[in-house]
Structures are given as structure tokens and as C-alpha cells.
């Protein structure tokens, strides 16, 4: 934590191929050890696979998948009177997209397809159809928030 004040976030530049900031953020989440070109080629190959399999515009399928993966509620731990409570809170928009991208990439990495572009493409297609592991994760988070609804009055 810096002592000299608030550090401003740098603006993410739009992706040159699809002209979308969300695609750039996905490339950043895919990137390992700063290898942006590798991450970009994986993503563009995945988008080509999505277009071949669905016959739709890959950016539209990806945005639909993101809407199905992004959480609305989550729980945060708060200590009250010596015991920890899981308090449901609404997720800020920036965190929603970050969590959605993180879950999409992490569950794509756990899939069993041969290459990463196939894994990512199939996870995006599954998420756009409201199936897949990333959507299941969102449902689990929402279920947890719903189960702890009784503690919502504690506010964070």
C-alpha cells in the first residue's frame, strides 16, 4: 500500500482486431510471464473456433458468456462479536468483469481439450449457453450469498 496517496488505474487500450477493451482485459488474464503475443494468438484462434462452431460473431458470443459468468452478489467475511459472518454484498462493476474473466480463464485451463485455444473456445461457448464450470462457479457464489441473506443487515 503506497503511503503517498491513491494510485490511479491506467486505462486499458481497446484491442486492435475487435476494438474492445473487454478483449484486451481477457488477453491480459490469459498472459503468462508477459507473453502478450502468445496470449493474443491463443485468444484469436479461440475466437475463430467459436465462429466455426456457432456460426455467430465471436465477440457477441463472448459478451453473452461474460454476462452469464459475472456475479451480481458475493459474500465477504466480517468479524462481529467474536465470530465471523459471511455477509452478502453487491459486486462493483469493475470487480464483476475481473471475476468473470478470472473464472473463465481459470476454468478453461482446467478443461481436457488438447490445446488452450480449444479449451478457451469451448468454455466461452458453454458459458454463452449458461453451462460450464465458470457459470457453475457464479451459481455457487450466488447460492452462498442467498444462504447468508440473514446477515445482510450488518452491511459492510
Swiss-Prot record:
The keyword Ribonucleoprotein applies. Disulfide bonds: none annotated. PANTHER family: RIBOSOMAL PROTEIN S7. It holds the Pfam family Ribosomal_S7. It comes from the Bacteria. One of its GO terms (cellular component) is small ribosomal subunit. PROSITE patterns: RIBOSOMAL_S7. One of the primary rRNA binding proteins, it binds directly to 16S rRNA where it nucleates assembly of the head domain of the 30S subunit. Is located at the subunit interface close to the decoding center, probably blocks exit of the E-site tRNA. The lineage of its organism: Bacteria, Bacillati, Bacillota, Bacilli, Lactobacillales. InterPro entries: Ribosomal_uS7 (IPR000235), Ribosomal_uS7_bac/org-type (IPR005717), Ribosomal_uS7_CS (IPR020606), Ribosomal_uS7_dom (IPR023798), Ribosomal_uS7_dom_sf (IPR036823). The gene is rpsG. Keywords: Ribonucleoprotein, Ribosomal protein, RNA-binding, rRNA-binding, tRNA-binding. Part of the 30S ribosomal subunit. Contacts proteins S9 and S11. The keyword rRNA-binding applies. GO terms for biological process: translation. GO terms for molecular function: rRNA binding; structural constituent of ribosome; tRNA binding. Belongs to the universal ribosomal protein uS7 family. This is Small ribosomal subunit protein uS7. NCBIfam families: rpsG_bact (TIGR01029).
Amino acid at each position: 500500500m503506497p503511503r503517498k496517496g491513491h494510485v490511479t488505474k491506467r486505462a486499458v487500450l481497446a484491442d486492435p482486431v475487435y476494438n474492445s477493451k473487454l478483449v484486451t482485459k481477457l488477453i491480459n488474464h490469459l498472459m503468462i510471464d508477459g507473453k502478450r503475443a502468445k496470449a493474443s494468438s491463443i485468444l484469436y484462434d479461440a475466437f475463430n473456433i467459436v465462429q466455426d462452431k456457432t456460426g455467430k460473431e465471436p465477440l457477441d458470443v463472448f459478451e453473452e458468456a461474460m454476462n452469464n459468468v459475472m456475479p451480481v452478489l458475493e459474500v465477504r467475511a466480517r468479524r462481529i462479536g467474536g465470530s465471523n459472518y459471511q455477509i452478502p454484498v453487491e459486486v462493483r462493476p469493475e470487480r464483476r468483469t475481473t471475476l468473470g474473466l478470472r473464472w473463465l480463464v481459470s476454468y478453461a485451463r482446467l478443461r481436457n481439450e488438447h490445446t488452450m485455444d480449444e479449451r478457451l473456445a469451448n468454455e466461452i461457448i458453454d458459458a454463452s449457453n449458461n453451462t460450464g464450470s465458470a457459470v457453475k462457479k457464479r451459481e455457487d457464489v450466488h447460492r452462498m450469498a442467498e444462504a447468508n441473506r440473514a446477515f445482510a443487515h450488518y452491511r459492510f
